[in-house]
């Protein structure tokens, strides 16, 4: 789904304009994203046991730009994680930059703006909302 040079960004501040001006919760390329996914799927990772059960709900999907070979889309995401008798909810606005190739799309960039991005703790261990 992701282009080889894709970027996945989760800003630390609401309305953050640039990845270089401030620390981010996540700023990963395809290699780091793959490492995170592999770690979450690894049964030998004690910090990830038992594995989280997750649910995602997208709503209000909109195409905000279409240049023919590039499409920008936004949506609202409700992400629920249940693990170790704790259920946590995350709400966010997601923006995708998609590269079109024939009848398919590849993700060139993904930005996830968490509603509670600036809370003091709790983001470090949640499963990546793909």
Each model region followed by its residue ranges:
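A solvent-exposed, acidic/Ser-Thr-rich amphipathic alpha-helical stretch
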Residues: 3-74
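A short local loop/turn or secondary-structure capping micro-motif enriched for an aromatic residue
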Residues: 17, 81-83, 115-118
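Solvent-exposed residues in well-ordered beta-strands and their adjoining turns
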Residues: 64, 78-80, 99-101
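Short beta-strand edge/turn micro-motifs at domain boundaries
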Residues: 72-74, 91-124
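Short, cysteine-centered beta-strand-loop-beta hairpins and adjacent loop/turn segments enriched
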Residues: 79-89
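Compositionally biased, intrinsically disordered linkers/stalks adjacent to structured regions
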Residues: 124-130
């Amino acid at each position: 789904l992701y282009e080889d040079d894709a970027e996945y960004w989760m800003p630390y501040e609401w309305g953050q304009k640039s990845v270089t001006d401030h620390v981010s919760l996540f700023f990963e390329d395809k290699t780091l994203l793959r490492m995170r996914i592999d770690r979450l799927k690894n049964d030998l990772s004690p910090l990830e046991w038992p594995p989280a059960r997750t649910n995602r709900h997208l709503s209000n999907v909109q195409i905000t730009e279409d240049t023919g070979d590039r499409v920008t889309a936004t949506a609202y995401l409700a992400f629920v994680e249940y693990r170790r008798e704790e259920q946590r909810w995350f709400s966010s606005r997601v923006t995708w930059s998609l590269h079109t190739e024939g009848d398919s799309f590849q993700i060139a960039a993904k930005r996830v703006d968490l509603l509670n991005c600036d809370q003091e703790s709790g983001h470090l261990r949640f499963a990546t909302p793909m």
